[in-house]
């Protein structure tokens, strides 16, 4: 199920579906939590998320999912979100990697998402090195 906001980012509405897409597309999940009565949320939607650079970065590296306060209260509680706007980044297994609260100018927002991406890559590399089964598969693949 998809919802289109006034920009080119495709916003999913199901976290489970976003995880499936992230896994099949080798991306991270960006979960955004907003409130219609929140000035910082509206500024984030109307300025930051409409920036070409932000749209391009999110589309390239993330599957985006959006939740609105009042409508998606269950998701706010599930993820422990009490302040808005909140941006959470998850790996394709649903592990939270990054959480930032508040308004960010476009360049700073891209920088923060880039940090989340690096953190996810570092975590994945660490897990890969620590998993003997994955190491054996990698060695076999390299020998082929």
Predicted regions and their residues:
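N-terminal leader/targeting and pre-domain segments
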Residues: 1-25, 118-139
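Detector for the c-type heme attachment site
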Residues: 42-46
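Short amphipathic alpha-helix with an adjacent loop that forms part of the alpha/beta core around
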Residues: 77-79
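CheY-like receiver
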Residues: 18-21, 75, 112
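Non-catalytic, surface beta->alpha helical segment in thiol-disulfide oxidoreductase systems
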Residues: 49-50, 82-123
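Thiol-based oxidoreductase modules, predominantly thioredoxin-like and allied folds used
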Residues: 7-13, 33-35, 47-73
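Short active-site neighborhood of thiol/selenol oxidoreductases, capturing the structured segment around
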Residues: 25-38
């Amino acid at each position: 199920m998809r919802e289109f906001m006034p920009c080119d980012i495709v916003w999913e509405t199901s976290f489970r579906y976003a995880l499936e897409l992230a896994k099949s597309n080798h991306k991270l999940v960006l979960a955004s939590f907003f409130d219609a009565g929140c000035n910082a949320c509206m500024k984030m939607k109307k300025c930051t998320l409409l920036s070409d650079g932000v749209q391009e970065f999110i589309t390239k590296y993330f599957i985006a999912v959006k939740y609105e306060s009042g409508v998606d209260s269950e998701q706010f509680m599930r993820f422990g979100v009490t302040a808005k706007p909140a941006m959470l980044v998850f790996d394709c297994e649903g592990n939270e990697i990054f959480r930032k609260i508040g308004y960010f100018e476009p360049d700073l927002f891209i920088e923060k998402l880039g940090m989340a991406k690096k953190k996810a890559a570092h975590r994945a590399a660490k897990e890969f090195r620590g998993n003997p089964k994955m190491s054996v598969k990698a060695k076999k693949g390299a020998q082929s």
